[in-house]
Amino acid sequence: MVIKSVGIESDKNSDTNERLINYNIEKPQVTQNVSNQLILTTLNDLYNWARLSSLWPLLYGTSCCFIEFACLLGSRFDFDRFGLVPRCSPRQADLIITAGTVTMKMAPSLVRLYEQMPEPKYVIAMGACTITGGMFSTDSYSTVRGVDKLIPVDVYLPGCPPKPEAIIDAVIKLRKKVAQENLVERGKLAQTHRYHSIKHELTLSSPVYTGKYLNSSARQTPPRSLSEATGVPVNLIFEMTKKNAIK
């Protein structure tokens, strides 16, 4: 005697019917092998990926920082793996790397090179002299105190000079910035004033270093704590310091 469950058979039939509906010819089943061969992306991401993988820099070296960048051309660091191809013409470059001191005479040339580069274009400021003027930032009449006064900077790379590893890190940060850009918002984020057109107005002032030290009143009059510690009156100490200064 064989006993069959009617409910179980009906459940099986419903499962088979559901499979036939879901996995028919018009709707093929997506397997794991097929999903591994598909890449889903957008046109914006594809465009950014192509640009960040082929940055063509224009090397603008005016000082000793450029020697550190020249180390990247060798096989030890091999910056070609990032798609960097140095160009000699600004019309073929989309990245300019300023390395070294920027003087007043070189400022118009730098701005002209930047204007000749096609859009979109990026700037990496390499070294302390490029970012703030470095050791030439004080008492210098011929040095630009920061290249961002001339052209917009995307990545600042401090150091005196920065190591080749730091340059690679700056390039990686720039690649991340390029990957996050949007084609629709690029026109809205475009800078209207790319550099300062106002000329430097240098005014004459009294010299800071006159060669005479201890001219301040605090330096000329000894503190009372000194007289109390030595037991000598303040007036006597003041006269002694005055005689030594005359001698």
Curated annotation (Swiss-Prot):
This is NAD(P)H-quinone oxidoreductase subunit K, chloroplastic. It comes from Mesostigma viride. InterPro entries: NADH_UbQ_OxRdtase-like_20kDa, NADH_UQ_OxRdtase_20Kd_su. [4Fe-4S] cluster binds at residues 64-65, 129, 160. The keyword Membrane applies. Its cofactor is [4Fe-4S] cluster. Disulfide bonds: none annotated. It is found in: Plastid, Chloroplast thylakoid membrane. Its EC number is 7.1.1.-. NCBIfam families: nuoB_fam (TIGR01957), PRK06411.1 (NF005012). One of its GO terms (molecular function) is 4 iron, 4 sulfur cluster binding. The gene is ndhK. NDH is composed of at least 16 different subunits, 5 of which are encoded in the nucleus. PANTHER family: NADH DEHYDROGENASE, NADH DEHYDROGENASE [UBIQUINONE] IRON-SULFUR PROTEIN 7, MITOCHONDRIAL. GO terms for cellular component: chloroplast thylakoid membrane; respiratory chain complex I. Belongs to the complex I 20 kDa subunit family. GO terms for biological process: aerobic respiration; electron transport coupled proton transport; photosynthesis, light reaction. It catalyses: a plastoquinone + NADH + (n+1) H(+)(in) = a plastoquinol + NAD(+) + n H(+)(out); a plastoquinone + NADPH + (n+1) H(+)(in) = a plastoquinol + NADP(+) + n H(+)(out). The lineage of its organism: Eukaryota, Viridiplantae, Streptophyta, Mesostigmatophyceae, Mesostigmatales. It is a peripheral membrane protein.
